[in-house]
Design a protein with these regions (language model features):
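Basic, glycine/lysine-rich polyanion-binding surfaces/domains
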Residues: 1-193
Length: 193
């Protein structure tokens, strides 16, 4: 197991959209979608580069985040400004965090009422909840299965958590969650790719 760590993730391209034709619009652009609400998948970029994390937030809303060096979201985002019928952009300027290492479940138990240790990770769950009073989106991933994340932050087979929140709450969430990580023997580091 690797050491407990919370890392604030660097800026990545993100895209949010919703509406009755949002899924159709994404599929037409080669994006692979999760079939079930509140689940995630990875979609390979069309140029064979990195991957895009695609989270389905309910039936008709999606959150996408690209690897640091990705180009797909930058290329397709401008077409959302064309007032498409049934496809509505959602501003995503989230602050992102990566929590990994031995003791993550103990940290999460102190800051959130969701029992993350009991989740079935094979279903690729997406959790929308409160963490230290802040609305967050959480994607648990198994280290060996991660693609498109910050490589090397967690060991193979370890459960790691991607966490996003409104950018105005990013500093507070980082400092507060970082303090709990430190109390549990881990470290909080600044920005990573």
């Amino acid at each position: 197991m690797s050491a407990l760590a919370l890392t604030r993730c660097g800026q990545r391209d993100r895209l949010g959209l919703k509406g009755p034709r949002a899924a159709e619009w994404l599929v037409a652009r080669g994006i692979v979608l999760p079939t079930a609400p509140n689940s995630w998948t990875h979609s390979q970029e069309s140029d064979g580069g990195g991957s895009i994390l695609v989270a389905r937030l309910g039936q008709v809303e999606f959150f996408l985040e690209e690897q640091a060096d990705g180009t797909t979201l930058k290329a397709i985002a401008p077409s959302l400004n064309q007032r498409l019928q049934g496809v509505y952009p959602v501003l995503r300027e989230d602050s992102g965090f990566h929590l990994s290492g031995e003791g993550t479940d103990a940290v999460l138990a102190q800051v959130c009422n969701v029992n993350f240790a009991a989740l079935t990770l094979d279903s690729h769950p997406v959790i929308m909840t409160l963490m230290i009073g802040v609305a967050v989106l959480v994607v648990p991933q198994v280290g060996a299965a991660r693609r498109g994340g910050a490589a090397g932050l967690g060991g193979a087979g370890e459960v790691e958590y991607r966490i996003w929140c409104d950018p105005t709450f990013g500093p507070y969430l980082g400092e507060s969650l970082g303090a709990v990580v430190s109390e549990c023997g881990g470290r909080y580091t600044g920005v990573s790719g």
